Amino acid sequence: VRLALATAALILAGCSTDSFVGPLAYTRSERLAIDLRTEEGQPKSRLQARVNQVMDEVFGDAPNHMKVPPGSGLRDGGAWLAANAVLPSKERPGRVFYERAGTEGTTDLVFIQGGYGLYRLHCLHCHGLSGDGMGPTAPYLWPRPRDYRRGVFKFTSTNSMKPSRDDLRRIITHGVHGTSMPAFESLMSKSDIEQVIEYVIFLAARGETELALVNEAMSADDADADTTVTNELGLQLAQTVFENWKLADT
């Protein structure tokens, strides 16, 4: 697969159709409020704020304004996450297309709707905007939808807690018997499913990085927030998380 639009240093802008209206904000981890407290039980507000700021810097401040950390291993640098890619040399997002295998050099290009848009359409109502398993339908389901943010998945064929892309492809395509996870084979094309896979990996890596930042900040003094929770630390933790995802596909 080769993109018709270069995707280095991507910032991604999501779709803006009527299907995706409403406020767009990631749900912050409950660990921010629970773990980042003093011995007296007072919130470490500066550390909490720094974790949020670093997450915004590394992954983007909203689902429709994503940043893809370098070295993520996501397809084509993350261009499959959203319908439009904002390049450093451009002021406006450009539509992203890819070439079907075997059609290189032709004009037979497929528009990437984007894993973000497809996720909002098909998955958000159960798995939530942040992948926390707290979508509006979730309270009525048992077992509850998976919380991607922990980076732990049950149905895997790998030796690690991370599923391979084949695992995710199988689950999304065929569903999971005995759970509320339906089969999407008749609702999404193969291309759509591939884009959702990339977005699920992005959400899971984002959530796991957030938890890792909280763990780093737990023992720090609130006054040291700026030197303890840095953008460099956030990027380093994100790259470590993405490396574990890459291993699942080896």
Question: What annotation goes with each model-predicted range?
Answer:
Residues 200-203, 210:
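Domain-length accessory/inserted modules outside core catalytic folds
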Residues 1-6:
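Sec-dependent signal peptide recognition
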